[in-house]
Amino acid sequence: LKFAIQSNDEAITTNGRMAITFLDDSTVKLTEHSQLLIDEYIYDPDPSKAKMALTFGLGTARFITGNLNRIDKQNITLKTPTANIAIRGTDFTATVDELGRSLIILLPDAFGLSSGEILVTTGMGTVTLNKPYQATTVSVFESKPSSPVILDLTLDMIDNMLIVTPPKEE
């Protein structure tokens, strides 16, 4: 389906999956039972006027940035119930459970290198994820994010575990 994305649109999946591609080529892929609110999206050739604000409330999503360098970094916000995520040109997944706890995993680029950097912030501190498969968890906004750890996984394993993309056919 193709339709225009507007501020305050909500994307909710039940037994299906959804992919949303924005005008700057950023993509959000939602798994089953996920909720995403597009608080604000303004695409403008002038990076100082462009803006993206998303709230991810439940489920699992993969965020693949497009030309976010066309949006000033301070104009990009992604929130979960327990964390705020600052995106610095990257590919990552976020999982939010029924209690609002968040798991954030930085994914590698096509060459297996870091795809960028994200800052995960709560009311008690910030951690930086800048290595492939580096992850942090946040239980409540009033606690610091866990120290980053490197997960012993591959992109195919993460895709299959999180059902972010269908398994590859052999």
For each predicted feature, which ranges?
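Short, polar loop/linker segments at the starts of domains and inter-domain junctions
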Residues: 1-4
